[in-house]
């Protein structure tokens, strides 16, 4: 039976209001807020690569080597931010995966229930048609007996 008033059904995740079905952009913004150091590391690495490219075009080997070292530091910073964020947010990610799994199971169950309801409706229509058809045959046989 569909939820008519569109209020959410009670769930074991009610204690965690941060869990909800989110769009891709909501997920990106949430992840940027959770781990702001990773994009900073990406930006630092990209900037170092851009400066290295400019130095290479200008044939400035000292600046080129300095920017390659800066790129390595940017990579190290980004890797550290990824590992530290993974450790720090590991439990929350586990809870989110459990929530997404439960949500998928709920959606699958709703699809199965809708499919079963559709089959029941079709079965009822088929039985009604057979009853009407049988009643019409009986009426035709009785009319034939009366005439003949």
Swiss-Prot record:
Residue ranges of domain HIG1 in the record: 9-100
Matching PANTHER family: HIG1 DOMAIN FAMILY MEMBER 1A, HYPOXIA-INDUCBILE GENE 1 HIG1 -RELATED
Annotated membrane topology: Multi-pass membrane protein
Transmembrane region(s): 36-53, 72-89
Quaternary structure and partners: Associates with the respiratory chain complex III/complex IV supercomplex.
UniProt family annotation: Belongs to the RCF1 family.
PROSITE patterns: HIG1
Keywords, comma-separated and alphabetical: Coiled coil, Membrane, Mitochondrion, Transmembrane, Transmembrane helix
Function of the protein: Cytochrome c oxidase subunit which plays a role in assembly of respiratory supercomplexes.
Name listed for the protein in its UniProt record: Respiratory supercomplex factor 1, mitochondrial
Key word Membrane present: yes
Predominant subcellular localization, coarse grouping: mitochondrion
Annotated compartments: Mitochondrion membrane
Coiled-coil regions listed in the entry: 89-148
Pfam families xref list: HIG_1_N
GO BP annotations, alphabetical order: mitochondrial respirasome assembly
Gene it is expressed from: RCF1
Matches recorded under InterPro entries: Hypoxia_induced_domain, RCF1
């Amino acid at each position: 039976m569909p939820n008519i008033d569109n209020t959410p059904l009670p769930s074991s995740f009610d204690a965690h209001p941060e869990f909800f079905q989110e769009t891709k952009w909501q997920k990106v913004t949430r992840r940027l807020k959770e781990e702001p150091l990773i994009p900073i590391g990406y930006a630092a690495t990209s900037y170092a690569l851009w400066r290295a490219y400019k130095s290479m075009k200008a044939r400035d080997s000292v600046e080129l080597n300095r920017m390659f070292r800066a790129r390595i530091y940017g990579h190290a910073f980004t890797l550290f931010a990824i590992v530290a964020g993974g450790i720090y947010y590991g439990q929350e990610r586990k809870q989110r995966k459990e929530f997404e799994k439960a949500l998928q199971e709920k959606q699958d169950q709703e699809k199965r229930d809708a499919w079963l309801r559709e089959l029941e409706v079709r079965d009822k229509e088929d039985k009604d048609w057979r009853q009407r058809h049988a009643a019409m045959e009986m009426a035709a046989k009785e009319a034939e007996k009366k005439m003949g």
